[in-house]
Curated annotation (Swiss-Prot):
<comment type="subunit">
    <text>Homodimer.</text>
</comment>
<keyword id="KW-0012">Acyltransferase</keyword>
<comment type="function">
    <text>Transfers a succinyl group from succinyl-CoA to L-homoserine, forming succinyl-L-homoserine.</text>
</comment>
<dbReference type="GO" id="GO:0005737">
    <property type="term" value="C:cytoplasm"/>
</dbReference>
<feature type="binding site">
    <location>
        <position position="375"/>
    </location>
    <ligand>
        <name>substrate</name>
    </ligand>
</feature>
<feature type="active site">
    <location>
        <position position="374"/>
    </location>
</feature>
<keyword id="KW-0808">Transferase</keyword>
<feature type="site" description="Important for acyl-CoA specificity">
    <location>
        <position position="343"/>
    </location>
</feature>
<dbReference type="GO" id="GO:0004414">
    <property type="term" value="F:homoserine O-acetyltransferase activity"/>
</dbReference>
<feature type="domain" description="AB hydrolase-1">
    <location>
        <begin position="43"/>
        <end position="380"/>
    </location>
</feature>
<feature type="binding site">
    <location>
        <position position="219"/>
    </location>
    <ligand>
        <name>substrate</name>
    </ligand>
</feature>
<keyword id="KW-0028">Amino-acid biosynthesis</keyword>
<comment type="pathway">
    <text>Amino-acid biosynthesis; L-methionine biosynthesis via de novo pathway; O-succinyl-L-homoserine from L-homoserine: step 1/1.</text>
</comment>
<comment type="similarity">
    <text>Belongs to the AB hydrolase superfamily. MetX family.</text>
</comment>
<dbReference type="InterPro" id="IPR000073">
    <property type="entry name" value="AB_hydrolase_1"/>
</dbReference>
<dbReference type="GO" id="GO:0009092">
    <property type="term" value="P:homoserine metabolic process"/>
</dbReference>
<feature type="active site" description="Nucleophile">
    <location>
        <position position="149"/>
    </location>
</feature>
Length: 409
């Protein structure tokens, strides 16, 4: 059973310098905490979120039993990241649409929503903002920083920007930068949004519209990259979707549809011979995912976050030499990859491992044979969960040893 989570907010009126050369004059950060901070404040873990996630990492909200956090299977009492042992902090990134200051919020200079005027933010900017929140909470050193996908990039960035403030970095299903293919996927998604007639140059709020068509397509493109070929074939194959009434064409699947499969089961064998209707179950599934996403995510946030992904490249300032870039890191590392993840393939994690080893850093690496593609980092694969549990149990033992040594002194 899930525990009750409570969102919190912290306001900052000290300008935050940005990598772009600009700044954010004042801003709010949304966050949640789970567990208890110990007496010497040494058991804190920051969890960094991926593209469409938030600070709501674990637990459920009061009276909303279906509101479980996006990594609730990983974090909580008795779970791999055990909140009976750790004080876990989930922080919503700047530019998001889930509570922290972002494009939907009012620009104090104009009295209108920022929209496209919200400054471009980077992974490094997010990490700097997170560090400021920890300062407010009185936490100087973290037991670990943990993240998957884009969150893993933030964990890696933490080890470079604040090497003295963390003991462990746990980087899951991530990469040291995006390759050209991933940048291309992001660009296709962004073009779908900015060419939507309702986008209005990013200032659609004041027009009372949402570029839903562009968001739907962006999500459909992105979702394809999160799944593996094996999973897509197993779930959908070439199965046809049951026909719908003409009035329902192009709409959400009808009531009773299983959205995880894309549409009601169909034993029909004939094609509709139409270029407009939903013919295959995979089409229905992608449309469902796009429709759902466009109902809760902000278009400007999508543009900002995908561009932050594109820009992340710690080796860039070191002539492309990742080993030189990682030389400042002092944390111990766990990296986890998944064999069928083609968005951030295992070879990308091995690049990080190799560079850390060349710097004589303490590194553990697990490559999990899982069929689920990039989304595997969110799922309950027993081998994956065992690796995570074992590593965090080791961190908990370190903390106990340190506490005993402090008490003896």
């Amino acid at each position: 059973m899930s525990f009750i989570a409570t969102p919190q907010f912290m306001h900052f009126d000290e300008p935050l310098p940005l990598q772009s050369g600009g700044s954010i004059a004042d801003y709010d950060l949304a966050f949640e905490t789970y567990g208890q901070l110990n007496a010497d404040k040494s058991n804190a873990i920051v969890v960094c979120h991926a593209l469409n996630a938030s600070h709501h990492v674990a637990g459920s909200y009061e009276g909303q039993p279906k509101s479980e956090g996006w990594w609730d299977n990983m974090i909580g009492p008795g779970k791999p990241v055990d909140t009976d042992k750790f004080f876990v902090i989930g922080i919503n990134n700047l530019g998001s649409c889930f509570g922290s200051t972002g494009p939907m919020h009012t620009n104090p200079a104009t009295g209108k929503p920022y929209g496209a005027d919200f400054p471009v933010v980077t992974v490094e900017d997010w990490v700097d903002a997170q560090a400021r929140l920890l300062d407010r909470l009185g936490i100087q050193t973290l037991a670990a920083v943990l993240g998957g996908s884009l969150g893993g990039m933030q964990a890696l960035s933490w080890s470079l920007r604040y090497p003295e403030r963390m003991r462990h970095a746990v980087v899951v299903a991530s990469a040291p930068n995006l390759n050209a293919e991933n940048i291309a996927f992001n660009e296709v998604a962004r073009r779908a949004i900015v060419t939507d007639p309702d986008f209005n140059g990013g200032h659609f709020y004041e027009h009372g519209v949402v570029p839903a068509r562009g968001l739907r397509i962006a999500r459909m493109v992105g979702h394809i990259t999160y799944l593996s070929d094996d999973v897509m074939n197993q779930k959908f194959g070439r199965s046809l979707r049951a026909p719908t009434l003409p009035a329902a064409r192009g709409s959400l699947p009808p009531e009773g549809t299983d959205p995880t499969r894309g549409g009601p089961a169909s034993d029909r064998r004939d094609y509709l011979y139409s270029t407009q209707d939903v013919e295959f179950q995979i089409e229905s599934y992608l449309r469902y995912q796009g429709e759902k996403f466009s109902g809760y995510f902000d278009a400007n946030t999508y543009l900002l976050i995908t561009r932050a992904l594109d820009y992340f490249d710690p080796a860039r300032c070191h002539d492309g030499d990742l080993t030189r870039a990682l030389a400042v890191a002092k944390a111990r590392f766990l990296l986890v990859s998944f064999t069928t993840d083609w968005r951030f393939a295992p070879a990308r994690s091995r690049e990080i491992v190799k560079s850390l080893l060349e710097n004589n850093r303490d590194v553990s690496y697990a490559e999990i044979d899982a069929p689920h593609g990039h989304d595997a980092f969110l799922l309950d694969d027993p081998r994956y969960m065992s690796v995570m549990r074992s590593y965090f149990e080791g961190i908990a033992k370190e903390l106990k040893t340190t506490e005993r040594a402090g008490g003896a002194a």
